[in-house]
Amino acid sequence: MHSQRIAPYKTLILNEFCYYPLKLDPTPFNALIFTSKNAVFSLLETLKNSPKLQILQNIPAYALSEPTAKTLQDHHFKVAFIGEKAHGKEFVQEIIPLLEKKSVLYLRAKEIASSLDTILLEHGIDFKQAVVYENKLKHLTLSEQNALKPKEKSILIFTAISHAKAFLHYFEFLENYTAISIGNTTALYLQEQGIQSYSTKKPSLEACLELALSLRVKEC
């Protein structure tokens, strides 16, 4: 389950992103937090029509993971820090000492899996949150659901809690399915739904695809 197609694998796109414009004065901030590439993409849409906000590209950015950092760098943002473990709870502990005495802007989704905002608040970090995108469930007709339903013995990769929620909204998780999750929060959510999943040491899609291939080879 992912938000973009990945050849040659079958991708179930059950969510769609809605980007919201950023409307604020950027001058008070001297640090940015990004925990998702989608926050970057949303901000880029805003920058097309808001030249005054382009100074945000010169403000040091703290990125949760390498993919998010690369997206920032590819669009000429100034990356100051990349999370080592790429998990929300570990990431916030990594950046708290770096954000003391800074004025921080956290660009986020409407719903977030981690309690990053709460932890920053508890540690007295001066920050403002801006919701710049939302991950919404796509509407699927019954015929579309039947066409998309994974075959028995499929290996399913869940790249986010929102994708796991969307899958379980439309489909039953069969006993002979195998689940792989990116990140601890996604694995925990699946576990809460009674689904055990494999996790990789490195929370990346590439690592999950490699694990899926190795599991498929073992079955043969």
Language model regions located:
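Signature of uroporphyrinogen-III synthase
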Residues: 1-220
